[in-house]
Amino acid sequence: MATLTNLEPLATGTVILKTTRGDIQIELWCKEVPKACRNFIQLCLEGYYDGTIVHRVVPEFLIQGGDPTGTGMGGESIYGEPFAVETHPRLRFIRRGLVGMACTENEGNNSQFFITLGPTPEWNGKQTLFGRVVGDTIYNVVRISELELDANQRPVFPPKIISTEVIDNYFTDIKPRSTKEEREKIANELAHQEKQKERNKLLKSGRRNKAVLSFGDEVDMPIVKKPLRQKTPVSRSSDTTTELSKDLISSSSSIHSTYSSAQTGLTSAKVSSDEYARQVDTLDTKLNSSSKSKVQEEISRLKSELRDLEKSGGSSNSKPVVVRPKKRNILTEELEKYKKSKKVVLGKRKNLENDEESTLRALSSFQSKIRNAEDEDVMDSQYGSKIEDTPCSLHNVPGCFSCFDRLGEKNITETNSNWFAHRLVAENDPTRRTEELRIQRAEELKDVPSARPKKLLMKRDII
């Protein structure tokens, strides 16, 4: 790689592409490929690549971007038309990380560019090579090449170029045609003009576009008011009287007889419309009075119920008490089981005075046991021979081997309290033995002559 890099000319420009997958630092050969480098730097200064995506990825071959449409068919150069391919004998596609202009055979270079992922010698002399990716940013290019792709070599989630930054500009005479802010302003104005045209069309047609949301800055559409329909006069004939009579009979059973008599009177005599209207009004008043009486009865019933509740001790605002079941507590259940198993001793805490008395009582009993054991040991030492000469109580034989110790064994009559009178005497004291050995060794070494020369011994004595 070092030898390959040394063959390439020195870079004279630097640009950083800030993507969603990390930065990509590109060094440019502006002296060798001036037209392509000027085009690329000016597009970066104008913010032309901001928001564009990497629309094509071929693993182990290349990644391609720079198309504002995101389809691979768009893009334009700063010259207003595609420019020709530029080549140089020292610039060849022999490794990964090389940046070139994307173009077809019939068309020239526009704004699209690609970055190689391996050697592509078939492009030498056919594509414009104008830069290289440097530093650790090459790993961001490799990371982009490992994305998930669809059948058309397009990333499922394409990375986006957030912004571009020109670090070293070789062409000091470049003047951007427009800045990013100016282009955004123009785009907003065009969008506003299109909305205004649509609004004017809707105003002319007299319809409101209900599919479009209305905001505060938009002009309210005029609402066409439809004329109210005038009520046509109702001819109160005998047929309408029969229908009204049926409705009134179903609404109130109390005035059924009155309304039926009126109906028969109207049908037989064919009364005028004024008389019919007067009878209908009387029926309405009766209906209203009957409904009011029912409401009054309901109010009086509720008041009586409230009085009964107050007398019984309850209040009208009091809510029924809902008895909720207690939650199961596993800890209390286990404690109850443990208490029932009689493994726990329940009682009050003892006083300190009683504890001291019990401790002193236990100490005195222990001391008495030690004294009794010492007395028994003394008695055995004084009267042991006499006891052995007496006949045993089991066999009635004096000096019985079964009941007395004749072979240095312990008697069966020993109790657990005999160890209180026992004294431990060490047969061989290790400290005493060590001291004896040291003295013996010192006496043996007295007669051994010293290995040091006499001159050294004399010097030591003089000092």
From Swiss-Prot:
The keyword rRNA-binding does not apply. Residues 250-261 have a biased composition (Low complexity). GO terms for molecular function: peptidyl-prolyl cis-trans isomerase activity. The keyword Repeat does not apply. It is found in: Cytoplasm; Nucleus. InterPro entries: Cyclophilin-like_dom_sf, Cyclophilin-type_PPIase_CS, Cyclophilin-type_PPIase_dom, Cyclophilin_A-like. It holds the Pfam family Pro_isomerase. GO terms for biological process: mRNA processing; protein folding; RNA splicing. Residues 11-166 form the PPIase cyclophilin-type domain. Residues 232-243, 262-271 have a biased composition (Polar residues). GO terms for cellular component: catalytic step 2 spliceosome; cytoplasm; U2-type spliceosomal complex. Keywords: Cytoplasm, Isomerase, mRNA processing, mRNA splicing, Nucleus, Rotamase, Spliceosome. It catalyses: [protein]-peptidylproline (omega=180) = [protein]-peptidylproline (omega=0). Its EC number is 5.2.1.8. It comes from the Eukaryota. Gene3D superfamilies: Cyclophilin-like. Its main location: cytoplasm. Residues 224-275 are annotated as: Disordered. PPIases accelerate the folding of proteins. Catalyzes the cis-trans isomerization of proline imidic peptide bonds in oligopeptides. Involved in pre-mRNA splicing. Belongs to the 40S cdc5-associated complex (or cwf complex), a spliceosome sub-complex reminiscent of a late-stage spliceosome composed of the U2, U5 and U6 snRNAs and at least brr2, cdc5, cwf2/prp3, cwf3/syf1, cwf4/syf3, cwf5/ecm2, spp42/cwf6, cwf7/spf27, cwf8, cwf9, cwf10, cwf11, cwf12, prp45/cwf13, cwf14, cwf15, cwf16, cwf17, cwf18, cwf19, cwf20, cwf21, cwf22, cwf23, cwf24, cwf25, cwf26, cyp7/cwf27, cwf28, cwf29/ist3, lea1, msl1, prp5/cwf1, prp10, prp12/sap130, prp17, prp22, sap61, sap62, sap114, sap145, slu7, smb1, smd1, smd3, smf1, smg1 and syf2. Belongs to the cyclophilin-type PPIase family. CWC27 subfamily. This is Peptidylprolyl isomerase cyp7. It comes from Schizosaccharomyces pombe (strain 972 / ATCC 24843) (Fission yeast). The lineage of its organism: Eukaryota, Fungi, Dikarya, Ascomycota, Taphrinomycotina.
